[in-house]
């Protein structure tokens, strides 16, 4: 079993949740709910892994909060 970190945002125009796996080309999806997005991302990643072991272009390192004056 493999674990990947997804970045998730909510589109203000459509109201959809949009997610992607940083550094994993093609690993992105959307859904009306967070559960739907999770299922969709799982399906996409499973399909991509079936096509062969991915070469990750980068690795998730974390999040930073930036405060500006």
Regions found by a protein language model. Name each.
Residues 25-34:
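A short, exposed loop/beta-hairpin motif centered on an aromatic-Gly-Thr core
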Residues 9-24:
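Short aromatic-glycine-(Arg/Gly/Cys) micro-motifs in beta-strand/loop hairpins
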């Amino acid at each position: 079993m493999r674990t990947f970190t997804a970045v998730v945002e909510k589109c203000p125009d459509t109201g959809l949740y949009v997610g992607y796996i940083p550094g994993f080309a093609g690993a992105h999806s959307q859904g009306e709910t967070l559960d739907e997005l999770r299922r969709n991302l799982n399906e996409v990643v499973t399909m991509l892994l079936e096509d062969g072991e991915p070469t990750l272009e980068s690795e998730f390192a974390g999040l930073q909060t930036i405060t500006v004056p």
